[in-house]
C-alpha cells in the first residue's frame, strides 16, 4: 500500500519533470535570474546552486547585478559557493545552454568593455526576447529607469549601505527562526511592503519602465533591479521582474508552452528536493 502511494506520487511528480539519463530536472524553455550579488554576504549562493542542480533550460538570462563589483571594491568577500556559481554558469554555457548576461548597475564596469564575451557567455546592455507564442519582450536590468540612479547615484550608494545593514540583521533573525523551526523571513522585503515611500518608489519604477516598453511597441518587459518579483499587466504591458537571490530567491521562467511564471525556489524546492531519496531508489 505504501509502495503504491509512492508510485502514484511519483507519476504525478513526473508530469513536471523531464527525464534525462539518471537525473530528473525541472525543464523550461528559458530561465531569467537577476540580482544575485555575488561578492556580498547577503547572496544566497547555496540556494542558487541548488536551483541550478534541479533545472535545465534552452536559455539562461542573467539580468544584471550578478556580480556586485560595488561591494567587492569596498570589501573583498568571495567564498567558495560564489566561485561555484560562476563555474556552474560557465559549465551550463559550455554544455549547450545559451547564456546571456545583461549588465546592471552593480556590475556596470562591464559596460565599458562591450562587446564582451566571458567564456561562452555574451554580455550586453539589453536584448529583445521572443517567446514561444511570438510575444516580444525587452530585457534590461532596469537601473536606467530608476530616478534615484539616474539623478542621484551617490544617494543610491548610501541606500546600498543601508540595505546591506538590514541584510546583516536578517542573518541573525533567520538564524533564530531556523532554530525555532520556522521559514526564512526578509526584514528588507517587509519594510518595502510596509513603508509608504518604498511602495511609492516601486510603483513609480514599474510604471515608468512599462511605459517605455509600450512606447517601443513591445508586448512586455523583463527586468530586475528593485528586488521585487512581479508578473502583472500595466496598461497592456506584461511587466515581469525576476526578483533576486538575496531575499526572495525567485526566478522568471518561460515554460515549454510559452507561459511565463515567477517561481519562488524556497517553495518549489519542497516539491523537488523532498523527492530526491525516492528518485535515487527508482533510478537504481
Task: Name what the model sees in each region.
Residues 142-205:
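Active-site-proximal loop/helix segment associated with metal-binding centers of metalloenzymes
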Residues 33-34, 61-64, 100-105, 139-140, ...:
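Active-site neighborhood of phospho(di)ester-bond hydrolases with catalytic His/Asp-centered motifs
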Residues 24-30, 129-138, 233-238:
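Beta-strand-turn-beta hairpins that frame and shape the catalytic cleft
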Residues 23-29, 40-131:
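Core catalytic region of metal-dependent phosphoesterases/phosphodiesterases
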Residues 119-125, 143, 148-157, 199, ...:
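Conserved beta-sheet core of the metallophosphoesterase superfamily
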Residues 272-284:
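C-terminal regulatory/interaction regions
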